[in-house]
Amino acid sequence: MLFDLINSFLKNGINNSNNNNNNNNNKNNFYNSLEDDDYLLNNQTTKVSLYLYFFIFAFMFLVVDLIMLYYKHRENIESRETDLSLKLNKMLIDFENDNKIKSSPTTSTTTTTITPTTTSSSQLRQPSTPKTTTKTINSPPSTPKSPPPLPSLESKLLYKDDIKQQLSLNEAKSQIDSAKQLDESLKYNSCIKLYIDGIEKLMALFSSYNSKEYRDYIDFYLKRAEYLKNELKKGTNLKSITNFNNFSKEYQINYNNKILEQQQQQQQQSSSTYRNSLNLSSSKSNSTINNRHSISSLSSLNSTTATTTTPSNTSTITSPGNKYGLQKSLSSTTLSLKKSSNSTNFQQPSPPSMVIPDIKGIDKSMVTLIMNEIMDRKNPVKWDDVVGLDKVKQSLMESVILPNLRPDVFTGLRAPPKGLLLFGPPGNGKTMIAKAVAYESKVTFFSISSSSLTSKYVGDGEKLVRALFAVATHFQPSIIFIDEIDSLLTERSSNESEASRRLKTEILVQFDGARTNGDERVLVMGATNRPEDLDDAALRRLVKRIYVGLPELETRLQIIQHLLVGQRHSLTKQQINSLAEVTQGYSGFDLAALCKDAAYEPIRRLGIGIKDLELNEISLISFKDFANSLKQIRPSVTSQSLKSFEKWNQKFGTI
């Protein structure tokens, strides 16, 4: 029985131990399974992280590589642009140097030679007429043209490498033509390099094909390439860059103006040289006459015979000391020759730097006189200098300036008028507006007065009128401005002289007669303050009649403000407005006189004491000074004349 009890105890213990082991094994298996799952999860997370890091690093390397490529490309572009800019600047410098060395002078210096006359002891001979030698240059083209064509090669090949030069020339021309096509298509970045490459090849052939046309061709495209480079460097919008055709027209206009300025400078130099030589001749002649007079006076001191005057106006001086009884005579003709040598024998030479065109039926001396009336543009008057007169400026812009800048647009019914009249009370800027038109329109401008077309010789006035219109037609587009036109084209009557009548008739015929052509670009602009005195035929030809009246309130305010610019004054804005209101009826000239008189008021108060004062110690111009000046400076235009102008404007005026 004990044995059975022990045996059952052992069995129970073994079973319990087995159960415990099973439980432990189950627990261990559970934990092992959990550990296996975490391990797998950790392995998968690690793999995903590695792939993610790999893609991130690859993307970063790609971005860095792209950035490096961008900056490298940008550096290459900047380097190429720098090289092109340096190459272009070098070509410009070389081209200017070649022009200075190889270009032949266009004019030769005018020299005036005076041959000294040998005089005997008995007779004073007439001085010889001065001889002048002049050379002329070709006149600038009258209308803007396209750039000069590439000059053709010589027919004879003088060197072995002429074929290579011809191929190089053709290649350069092909590159420039391609660049021109890109230029017209607004592909400016691409055309600059082709321009530079083509010009570089042309400049390499300078020694073989050096001519004016060749230089002009290179100069035009050099200027175009330089202009495009500067505009692109500034970041200008492509549509705002001047296109090829407009640039060509502007280049030709500037080229013509440059030649005209050079001609005027050379004309002034030659005229001064001629005057100096003429004065030298006169001084020599006068010294010779004085010597003869001194000899005659010394002889007359011992003379016992009085001086007698004969009907032939010859003064005879007899000297008893003369061994052979010779008479020393000075005729009045010889003496008058000395006085009138400037007007008769010594004719004004033609300007050597201005070409004298060969015009059928026109004397060259008349043409020379007319060409001296071409206005000089050294001191130009611009639109901004003309204060107020907005309606007048707008009308002139439409009638004069725009048609000359775009002649292709203003054709047919848009063709500009051939005659224009500025009328109104004096002192309101009619002449100043004409000067502004002369500068802004960029055309040949003739400033004519009545003295320019009158002569003491019968028939010369009509010849001068004919020469004026012929020269203006030759240099068209051009403007003929006649100040105080009423002095030339007053109403014809039976009481006037025959010469005046012929002169008016010739002006009207040349203005718009049977020989005139509708395609001529010659505008006649007149200014007057007596429009009622003009002839009816002249009014018919002066189609556009613009009234330049007294300044209005706003214009008077602008004029006063413009005159006070740069002056030391204490006027407030309200006081300036008050001045503009109280000056109703004042012309532009009256306002200028008023401001000048007011500026003198502080100096009047100082008197002689101003010599000891500094400039900044002089008192400022005050409103009180203007009040004192208003008592002295009155309007110069009467109300009656103003009413007559307004009445004439309502009847015949345009605006």
Curated annotation (Swiss-Prot):
Reaction catalyzed: n ATP + n H2O + a microtubule = n ADP + n phosphate + (n+1) alpha/beta tubulin heterodimers
List of residues binding ATP: G424, P425, P426, G427, N428, G429, K430, T431
Xref: Pfam families: AAA (PF00004), AAA_lid_3 (PF17862), MIT (PF04212), Vps4_C (PF09336)
Pro residues bias spans: 141-151
InterPro entries: AAA+_ATPase (IPR003593), AAA_lid_3 (IPR041569), ATPase_AAA_core (IPR003959), ATPase_AAA_CS (IPR003960), MIT_dom (IPR007330), MIT_dom_sf (IPR036181), MT-severing_AAA_ATPase (IPR050304), P-loop_NTPase (IPR027417)
MIT domain boundaries: 169-232
Enzyme class: isomerase
Cytoplasmic side: 1-58, 80-655
Protein location: Membrane; Cytoplasm, Cytoskeleton, Microtubule organizing center, Centrosome; Cytoplasm, Cytoskeleton
Tagged with keyword Nucleotide-binding: yes
Keyword Transmembrane helix: no
Homology family: Belongs to the AAA ATPase family. Spastin subfamily.
Protein name per the record: Spastin
The species this protein was found in: Dictyostelium discoideum (Social amoeba)
